[in-house]
Amino acid sequence: MVKFIESELVLLKKEIDEMWTLVYNQLDRAGDAVLTLDRELAQQVLVRERRVNAFELKIDSDVEDIIALYNPVAIDLRFVLAMLKINTNLERLGDFAEGIARFALNCHEPALDTELVKQLRLEEMIAQVLSMLELAKQALQEESQELATAVFAKDNMLDEINADATAILADYISRHPESALSCLNLVSVLSLIHI
């Protein structure tokens, strides 16, 4: 019995790794789609979101099966529940990627103002989120509390960047009222990126 649950836990961790990679790629594509307003790339993110949702359901089902069939206790139960929580959060990040891609798909501007992107530090925010995801995955794989703690430091940097965004956008809207709708929609993108 112990050997069976161990193999199931290894498979579950492998599935979480695959889901993590899928969501990372979704966020990366969505970020690129926003920065370039590439509607085709944004559409790819929307199409792949169905795969993220299906994968989440499969992992949920696998977790239920492990609990029902093997009745894990102690460390195994904590591991299974942690994988369930990670799976839920990854699916939520996939939803955020979809929301970011929708902005790129529905934006009426031909391109984002490069100066605005620079002031908002949008590229830096996207890179920071992707870095946080990589670091969190590495922390899980290596079971490193130190790496997990480093994710929080990166989150503080995102907070700092995001804190200035509203004032920057308000100033931009006052100087470019024709872009007000896109700027207001960009606020929601920033909140999604800020996760």
Model-found features: residue ranges?
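Cytosolic, long alpha-helical scaffolding segments
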Residues: 1-193
